[in-house]
Amino acid sequence: PGGLPWLSEADRRLQVQSDLPWWLVCRGAIHKFRCVPHLTGRRFEHGVTDCYTLFRDAYHLAGIEMPDFTREDDWWRHGQNLYLDNLEATGLYQVPLSAAQPGDVLLCCFGSSVPNHAAIYCGDGELLHHIPEQLSKRERY
């Protein structure tokens, strides 16, 4: 839309139905969009459809590629710090919460001394996130 390198809403609906990657040519460049299911209403499966997958998929739809990395359940209880260890290599950097912009990733510590949950700040006090044993959703915090 408007010469920008991302799929339109109609393209996304058709892509989800087809369950295939789509290619888009924009301003002479070719962009590949892997098939990403709807961001809300996903069932939670650690390492497959979890909070990291949700934010990775949301960023992909915005044209930003984040690496996938193997993660075992409860990695934060076994001395790993996967978010901080892996995200710095992608070019992300820490900002104060007061400076958060829509689209920024918020890292949270749930019963852990290291960040073990990621959420996307949507603006106006809303987050997009995926908690174990719940469907992914957008909600006020």
Predicted features and spans:
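Short HxH-centered metal-ligating active-site micro-motif
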Residues: 1-10
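Short, flexible beta-strand-to-coil junctions
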Residues: 2-3, 25-28, 108-114
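...with weaker cross-activation on analogous glycine-rich loops/strands in unrelated enzymes
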Residues: 9-11, 72-136
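Divalent-metal-activated hydrolytic enzyme cores
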Residues: 13-37
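Short helix-to-loop capping/linker segments positioned immediately adjacent to catalytic or ligand/cofactor-binding
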Residues: 39-47, 94
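Active-site nucleophilic cysteine motif
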Residues: 44-62
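Surface-exposed patches in mature extracellular/periplasmic domains of secreted proteins
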Residues: 66-71
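Short, Lys/Arg-rich amphipathic alpha-helical interaction segments
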Residues: 138-141
